[in-house]
Amino acid sequence: MRSNNNNPLTRDEILSRYFPQYRPAVAASQGLSGGSCIIAHDTHRIVLRRHHDPDAPPAHFLRHYRALSQLPASLAPRALFYTPGWMAVEYLHGVVNSALPDAEELAALLYHLQQQPRFGWRIALSPLLAQYWSCCDPARRTPFWLRRLKQLQKNGEPRPLRLAPLHMDVHGDNIVLTSAGLRLIDWEYAGDGDIALELAAVWVEDERQHRQLADAYAARARIDARQLWRQIRLWHPWVIMLKAGWFEYRWRQTGEQQFIRLADETWRQLRMKG
């Protein structure tokens, strides 16, 4: 269901107009980006998501809704409703574990996603990195950051190994173990891109876990494991800069200390690697 109202409504207006029998239940923890609440009627629950990024155009939020509308129930919650500034999606009953599932299970989930039809819009990291630089706190801009940004822009993004739909925010808190298997939530960064970019961006604990995931995916996708790992490593500096820039971006937007701590730690990792 999609509404054509062009003016963003408040949460209470959304509830009274479209979900009059529902009431707020608890806040939804869906990754670091937030912007969600759970509404309930008797035992039925729905996740109500708000467009929480004031710097992102409304089209980005609409893409999120369209991605969920395209995806099968074996991968993601169903999209239920959209109006400018808000969407409602199915609440997935299950267990969320901050740790990633084992390599074989996660590789199977990502491979299943990447066998789906493409979304129809490409993920482009270079303009996103430039946006994070321009939108961050000016006091946080450093010569090191600018040098790394210019070097990546000069080199250009790696040529894709294989284009497919990507989730681009795969970590334990965005994976729900339901009675029917693993499902991914929080699809706001989804788009089409290189499968190796998705694997490079997974929030792994260490290189050993990363290699296990890459090898499991290569076996399932029938790709040479060494070739896939080389491609993942080509994307690695882009992904680290993406994470650092996003933390800076969210720090400027929210002032929340968790983001500045994460940004500082990511910059330290980059400096250690030269």
Curated annotation (Swiss-Prot):
UniProt KW keywords? ATP-binding, Kinase, Nucleotide-binding, Transferase
UniProt xrefs under InterPro entries:
Aminoglycoside_PTrfase, Kinase-like_dom_sf, Thiamine_kinase
Entry's EC annotation: 2.7.1.89
What reaction is this protein's catalytic activity? thiamine + ATP = thiamine phosphate + ADP + H(+)
Report the record's Gene Ontology biological process terms.
thiamine diphosphate biosynthetic process; thiamine metabolic process
Molecular function GO labels = ATP binding; thiamine kinase activity
Enzyme kind, highest EC tier = transferase
Pathway annotation from the record: Cofactor biosynthesis; thiamine diphosphate biosynthesis; thiamine phosphate from thiamine: step 1/1
According to its UniProt entry, what is the function of this protein? Answer: Catalyzes the ATP-dependent phosphorylation of thiamine to thiamine phosphate. Is involved in thiamine salvage.
Family, similarity comment: Belongs to the thiamine kinase family.
Q: Which HAMAP family does this entry report, sorted A to Z?
A: Thiamine_kinase
Name under which the protein is recorded: Thiamine kinase
User: What is the organism field in this record?
Assistant: Salmonella gallinarum (strain 287/91 / NCTC 13346)
| Encoding gene per record | thiK
